[in-house]
């Protein structure tokens, strides 16, 4: 999955943005709902307006899960097992949505990092988010 340098890069970047992670979670979901409006179908009970408490709270859950995954890169399957089960069996989320969310998170990360969002950071986070999406989608097979 990630080499030692990429792992260090992902963890280092996460430490830099951790203080803004809740805001980033909200921005990621808001962006996903705007760019990929079909993703809204999984949230029929949410107020999907920009700045809603429900988007803010769910965004916190998303970035908290990403933070846990970063802390447990060597054990992603176990770390994300409950989320994988929830999304596959209870919520029945189409796994393509994990990739859409990852794309939106990359954009938000780039906005927050500015020039520190280097090609190396992009590649490292792309590998990380691809691995997370793959683990979340495993239950669908």
Curated annotation (Swiss-Prot):
Binding sites annotated in the UniProt record for heme b: 58, 87
Tissue: Red blood cells.
Signal peptide: none
Start and end residues of each Globin domain: 1-141
Record carries keyword Iron: yes
Example GO biological process: hydrogen peroxide catabolic process
Gene Ontology CC: one annotated term: hemoglobin complex
Entry-linked Pfam families: Globin
GO MF annotation: an example: heme binding
Keywords, comma-separated and alphabetical: Heme, Iron, Metal-binding, Oxygen transport, Transport
Family under the similarity heading: Belongs to the globin family.
Functional summary from the UniProt entry: Involved in oxygen transport from the lung to the various peripheral tissues.
Subunit structure: Heterotetramer of two alpha-D chains and two beta chains.
Name of the protein: Hemoglobin subunit alpha-D
Biological source species: Phalacrocorax carbo (Great cormorant)
């Amino acid at each position: 999955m990630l080499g030692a340098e990429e792992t260090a890069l992902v963890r280092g970047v996460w430490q830099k943005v951790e203080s803004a992670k809740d805001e980033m979670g909200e921005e990621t979901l808001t962006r996903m709902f705007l760019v990929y409006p079909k993703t809204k179908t999984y949230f029929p009970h949410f107020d999907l307006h920009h700045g809603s408490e429900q988007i803010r709270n769910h965004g916190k859950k998303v970035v908290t899960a990403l933070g846990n995954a970063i802390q447990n890169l060597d054990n992603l399957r176990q770390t994300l097992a409950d989320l994988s089960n929830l999304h596959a069996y209870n919520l029945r989320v189409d796994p393509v949505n994990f990739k859409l969310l990852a794309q939106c998170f990359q954009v938000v990360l780039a906005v927050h990092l500015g020039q520190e969002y280097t090609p190396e950071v992009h590649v490292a986070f792309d590998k990380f988010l691809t691995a997370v999406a793959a683990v979340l989608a495993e239950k669908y097979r």
